[in-house]
């Protein structure tokens, strides 16, 4: 399972695109109509087809094909509505759509949908420690992306999203050597932006708190 920031690094998409529909966010009545086709398949077959669609979805992401990735995650959901990875993968795609949105309103919609899908994925999160940790990394990254988006238009909203990202990260810090983790940039970038916000707002105590949490190299850029 790739984390969101790994996938964002891989995916540089042409700016002009029409996002594929995410069926997981359709109204309940429409979802029930779509899911009716599941009754044509035996249980074991449905699970295998769902797992295969997840694999194809991430293969499409590797090829920077967001629309086909979304279609595959939709297919995984149709065969198994409790497949956590269908929601998770769709959430990643929505985050990447936001990175390539044509305007602010479109980007905001994609970001909000990404967060909704992460919330849906949490309902079906397994007990596997590694899966849980990777999910938390991606979930924190989604709040970080939202915070960055709102930095120019609504700094209070940006602060809220950055604090959500930090809150997800804090439990992970107990078991992590941050200097050795490739995903530590999510945490450090979050703290860097909070440091700048609190400095600009004149909140000295909070400014010092987050400044002291940063590596020396990042402090120089403030």
Where are the model-predicted features located?
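Conserved structural position within tetratricopeptide repeats
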Residues: 77-78, 116-123, 167, 174, ...
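Alpha-helical segment of the N-proximal tetratricopeptide repeat
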Residues: 46-71, 75-78
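Short coil turns that delineate tetratricopeptide repeat
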Residues: 81, 126-130, 170, 219
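TPR alpha-solenoid repeat register
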Residues: 86, 131, 135, 183-184, ...
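Short coil/turn linking the two alpha-helices of tandem helical-hairpin repeats
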Residues: 58, 96-105, 140, 145-154, ...
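Canonical tetratricopeptide repeat
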Residues: 89-90, 138, 145, 186, ...
């Amino acid at each position: 399972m790739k984390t969101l920031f790994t996938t964002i690094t891989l995916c540089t998409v042409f700016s002009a695109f029409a996002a594929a529909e995410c069926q997981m966010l359709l109204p309940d009545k429409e979802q029930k109509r779509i899911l009716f086709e599941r009754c044509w398949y035996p249980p074991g077959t449905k699970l295998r087809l769902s797992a295969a669609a997840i694999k194809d979805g991430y293969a499409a992401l590797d090829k920077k094909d967001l629309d086909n990735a979304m279609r595959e995650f939709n297919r995984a959901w149709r065969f198994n509505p409790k497949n956590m990875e269908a929601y998770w993968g769709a959430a990643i795609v929505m985050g990447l759509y936001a990175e390539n949105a044509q305007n602010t309103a479109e980007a905001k919609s994609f970001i909000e949908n990404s967060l909704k899908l992460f919330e849906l994925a949490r309902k079906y999160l397994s007990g596997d420690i590694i899966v849980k940790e990777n999910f938390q990394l991606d979930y924190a990254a989604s709040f970080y992306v939202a915070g960055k988006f709102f930095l120019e238009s609504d700094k209070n909203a940006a602060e809220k999203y950055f604090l959500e990202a930090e809150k997800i990260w804090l439990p992970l810090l107990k078991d992590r050597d941050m200097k050795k983790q490739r995903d530590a940039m999510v945490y450090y970038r979050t703290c860097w932006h909070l440091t700048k916000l609190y400095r600009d707002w004149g909140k000295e105590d909070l400014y010092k708190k987050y400044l002291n949490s940063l590596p020396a190299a990042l402090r120089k850029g403030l």
